[in-house]
A protein has these predicted regions:
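Phosphate/nucleotide-binding beta-alpha loop and adjacent structural elements of enzyme active sites
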Residues: 1-154
């Protein structure tokens, strides 16, 4: 899979060509979609990024001096988040947990991988998919106490 490197608003990142990655980075880093909705990220805050996708919000928060725990069930997205955190020197600010957040205490679930590169459409809902993988789960209530703020996009 080919990765292309670029930057927006001073944040560098790799994205996968032919996937929805670049659209997500533009929406979050360039268009500032979360900040336009009244969300504010302050220096020294701690955040949970629930449904981290490719890590665009995590990079945004870390660039503002916040620490972030990113939850993302797709292992390929997790690799990309870690690579981009390292690229920006944010490996101490962004912690990636490869897991689906759930309301109960199940240990794992099945993640249906979206087709056509639309990785924001991955789901743990029962859905026919050409590709599905088993992923670990974490209980949301237990994780919620770990940070001051939460961005949830799941």
């Amino acid at each position: 899979m080919k990765l292309t490197k670029t930057s927006l608003n001073g944040v560098q990142f790799f994205y996968r060509e032919g996937y929805s990655d670049i659209k997500t980075f533009i929406e979050v880093l360039s268009n500032q979609s979360y900040l336009k909705k009244g969300m504010e990220v302050l220096n020294n805050e701690s955040w949970l990024d629930c449904g981290g996708n490719v890590g665009a919000f995590s990079l945004l928060a870390a660039s503002k001096g916040a620490s972030v725990i990113t939850y993302e069930p797709d292992p390929f997205n997790c690799e990309l988040i870690e690579k981009n955190a390292k690229l920006n020197g944010f490996q101490n600010a962004i912690t990636v947990k490869q897991a689906a957040l759930v309301h109960d205490f199940r240990k794992d679930t099945t993640l249906s991988i979206a087709q056509n590169g639309n990785v924001w459409r991955n789901t743990i809902m029962k859905k026919k998919s050409n590709k599905a993988i088993k992923v670990p789960c974490l209980n949301f209530d237990e994780q919620a106490v770990l940070a001051d703020n939460c961005k949830m996009d799941i």
